[in-house]
């Protein structure tokens, strides 16, 4: 929210810390206590993830996602909410929802078919297969997959290029 109102912000970067980008939503805090009411996962998504996806999509400046490792579930879909996604060649994307009986959330059912086509989106969503960053780039799901050793430099160059552009018109 602070970045939205800051005129000095020219581009927004979303990335992970450590070896992975984002393993997705932590469902452990959604466990039902003995005798307790079922947790409404839909309400949780509406409260926690939908506002983040909408904020990314409505930023007045370009949004870049730098995927530095595994992007699973909601993590993969948060990446897809950004304008440009660049990933290390060792990164991967996994629509892991089917493994736990959930429908892809955080914009997954919206973005996947638009980026990779209906058949591929259905396959990714129903099978939960790991998609390499290189395959994701070949399918048009992300902008590019970069050698791990050159990743930081490539991201910095991309950010500088976007920040130097007329960002309101991009």
Could you tell me what each predicted segment is?
Residues 1, 8, 16-55, 71, ...:
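Glycine- (often His-adjacent) and acidic-residue-rich active-site loop
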Residues 7, 54-168:
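Crotonase-fold acyl-CoA enzyme core
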Residues 12-14, 64:
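Conserved hydrophobic packing residues within short motifs/helices of P-loop NTPase cores
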Residues 14-16, 170:
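Short glycine/serine/threonine-enriched helix-capping/active-site loop
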């Amino acid at each position: 929210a602070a970045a939205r109102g800051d005129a000095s912000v020219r581009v927004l970067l979303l990335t992970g810390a450590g070896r992975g980008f984002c393993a997705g939503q932590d469902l452990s805090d959604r466990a039902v206590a003995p005798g307790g009411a079922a947790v409404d996962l839909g309400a949780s998504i509406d409260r926690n993830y939908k506002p983040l996806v909408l904020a990314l999509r409505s930023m007045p400046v370009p949004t870049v996602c730098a995927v530095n490792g595994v992007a699973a579930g909601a993590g993969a879909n948060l990446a897809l909410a950004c304008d440009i996604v660049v990933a290390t060649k060792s990164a991967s994307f996994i629509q892991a929802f089917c493994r736990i009986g959930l429908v892809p959330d955080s914009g997954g059912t919206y973005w996947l078919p638009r980026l990779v086509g209906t058949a591929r989106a259905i396959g990714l969503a129903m099978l939960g297969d790991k998609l390499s960053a290189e395959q994701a780039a070949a399918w048009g799901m992300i902008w590019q997959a970069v050698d791990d050793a050159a990743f930081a430099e490539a991201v910095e160059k991309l950010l500088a290029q976007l920040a130097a552009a007329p960002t309101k018109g991009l």
